[in-house]
């Protein structure tokens, strides 16, 4: 996540987002549990924007001074999430599903881990992981595929040392069944979650993700009989949200909602899932 921030820094200290903006593109990035994604949206100058994207993930230009500045920025981002009840609820629920694993740790990091990050850590991470073999490019829209293929065929192909990442199984501990947080909120919040069992191949994960979303939407979504009854009786509002994560190493479903009757709804939702 820290490296994601710093890759937007160009050699002349200009922010890469400004370069995308000059080409009429909107750019962004995010880091999830398993990947970092860099994206842009544009109606013109596709190849020029691809040049910027290649530059973005192709080299690093940060300094010790800029890393120190970024530490303060990310500490502020972390504090912002700590003050967000929905974010706190989600990550606390995840920590209960996967106690004592990396999934129980906030992606942004802790105050201590952020303060300890150095230029050498970031460059080592970049050197080992930011290689074409670890990257996928997705283009969506009215695009001439041949033009894009020709564009990449002209790019210089570098000979890179292969690096194998050993993916270890998560050391699964028993799920923590119930927990609570205390924050100042206008309405109590509830999360009901399920941890999947067994492993799913990468090829199966997309289909499995869609199936889970369809199943839980039919069971609890806005058009379901269950939701309509709870909504009409005032026990549930439109805040109901579904989060599905499917990966070859883990998969889970988390339902979050605002409700004046968290204990009653927790019982009803858990009973329906069983």
Name each model-derived stretch:
Residues 161-225:
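His/Glu-based metal-binding/catalytic segments typifying zinc-dependent metallopeptidases
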Residues 1:
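Short, conserved beta-strand/beta-arch hydrophobic-aromatic motifs that form part
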